[in-house]
Amino acid sequence: MSILISPSNNTGWGLRFPSKMFGGAKKRSDQHPVRVRGHYRAPWGAHKRGRTGRTTVDDAIDAVVEEARNYTPTPPPVSTVDAAIQTVVRGARRYAKMKRRRRRVARRHRRRPGTAAQRAAAALLNRARRTGRRAAMRAARRLAAGIVTVPPRSRRRAAAAAAAAISAMTQGRRGNVYWVRDSVSGLRVPVRTRPPRN
């Protein structure tokens, strides 16, 4: 292993320039000894070139940076005027919603003056809701038996009015209404059960 003994910052062996071999002398002598150890490079980080230690200014800067990092903005002051306005708006919306609900319920339960057929159809549906399917069929047969004496044109009008009333009353209820021709009177009557297919 060769040893680098050039005094010119480790840039060469000094073979082309013999004057660099012995510290500027042409030949080695006691007045110009060769310092091999002094020309080795120091390990990395041994010489801190231009770097100084921490000062009080660095501590102050670090304190400011830490305070800025931990900064939490204060919430804005609560405005009582905005809170009052929001309360009034919420109350107005609640009142309007309640009025809409009441109007909807009143429209649903509004009683329209109807004909005898419409009242009979309403009574039939109410009775069917109370007593079940078999009672509904019995009530339909009784209703059909009672309408036999109505003249033909009035009978058609009454049937149409009853159908309209029944369809209007059964819109919000689940289930189907089947129109079945009664074998006794020959009229179509509403039933809840599906008739058998012949």
Swiss-Prot record:
Keywords from the UniProt entry: Acetylation, DNA-binding, Host nucleus, Host-virus interaction, Late protein, Phosphoprotein, Viral penetration into host nucleus, Virion, Virus entry into host cell
Positions of the UniProt region annotated as Disordered: 24-55
Function: Plays a role in the inhibition of host immune response within the nucleus. Interacts with cellular nucleosomes and immobilizes the host immune danger signal HMGB1 on chromatin. In turn, prevents HMGB1 release out of the cell and thus decreases inflammation. Also plays a role in the wrapping and condensation of the viral DNA. May also promote viral genome import into the nucleus.
Species annotation: Human adenovirus C serotype 2 (HAdV-2)
Name of the protein in question: Pre-histone-like nucleoprotein
Oligomeric and partner information: Interacts with the core-capsid bridging protein; this interaction bridges the virus core to the capsid. Interacts with host NPM1; this interaction might play a role in placing the pre-histone-like nucleoprotein on the viral DNA or regulating viral gene expression. Interacts with host HMGB1; this interaction inhibits host immune response.
Sites marked Cleavage: G24, A25
Xref: Pfam families: Adeno_VII
Nuclear localization signal (motif): residue ranges: 188-198
Positions where N-acetylserine occurs in the chain: S2
Basic residues: compositionally biased ranges: 34-52
UniProt family annotation: Belongs to the adenoviridae histone-like nucleoprotein family.
Modified residues (Phosphothreonine): T55, T74
Inducing or repressing factors: Expressed in the late phase of the viral replicative cycle.
Post-translational modification N6-acetyllysine, affected residues: K27, K48
Molecular function as annotated in GO: DNA binding
InterPro entries reported for this sequence: Adeno_VII
One GO cellular component term: viral capsid
Further comment: All late proteins expressed from the major late promoter are produced by alternative splicing and alternative polyadenylation of the same gene giving rise to non-overlapping ORFs. A leader sequence is present in the N-terminus of all these mRNAs and is recognized by the viral shutoff protein to provide expression although conventional translation via ribosome scanning from the cap has been shut off in the host cell.
